[in-house]
Amino acid sequence: MKKPITAQSLRRTNVLAGILHLAQMAAVLALSSDFSLPITATYMAGPPGSTFAAPVVLFNTPVGLTVAIFLGLSALAHFIVASPQFFGRYSAGIAAQRNYFRWVEYAVSSSVMIVLIAQVTGVSDISAIISLFGVNASMILFGWLQEKYETPGNGGWLPFIFGCIAGIVPWVALVFYVFSIGGVEETSAPAFVYGIVFTIFSFFNSFALVQWLQYKKVGKWSDYIRGERTYITLSLIAKSALAWQIFANTLIPS
């Protein structure tokens, strides 16, 4: 017989997840090369619609540090909710079928992840990077609104639907770069880029699936606390998958 999931067992799960995220962050920082990707801007060199100046590199993003940031953010969030100062608020939120801590962390960490994926596929323009970050964060915040204003089983889905609409936008943009739509014939993404995009796209959608199952009250998912543990597990797996796919293909010192 399976043990029931309790607030205290979730506390231990958060501590373990925090340790695993932190250990991976330290490993990435210790083992990574100084590989970086550019952030660029293209400015007008004449009237609108005429000519543009050559793209300029505004700065370079250290990829190893970016990976460490989203791992570190997750570690920090897990340790915060497990701490004596915040665990009471966290467990009360879980009992009320909401976890606002989750949405704050995801809004930042998953947006850093989508920006990194975009850069790996070839997106470098500063306006595109900012837009992708903002749209992805909006998707997460709609998930927050779903929990704030709706309850599982009440049939309210508007924030969830808006979140799905916002969430698909970055992936539509990435398709153009991954498959070189409209590009010259010689342009193509490396094989590992396809793997990263497919893997993380699948994980991102699995988070939406968990919320859908919770709010439809499907089987075991009618127990909100089970969904919370699933979110923790998915977050760890998704971030680990992206971190080590990036490391294996771009960050191993030569």
Predicted regions and their residues:
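Polytopic alpha-helical membrane-helix bundles and their juxtamembrane interface segments
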Residues: 2-99, 110-254
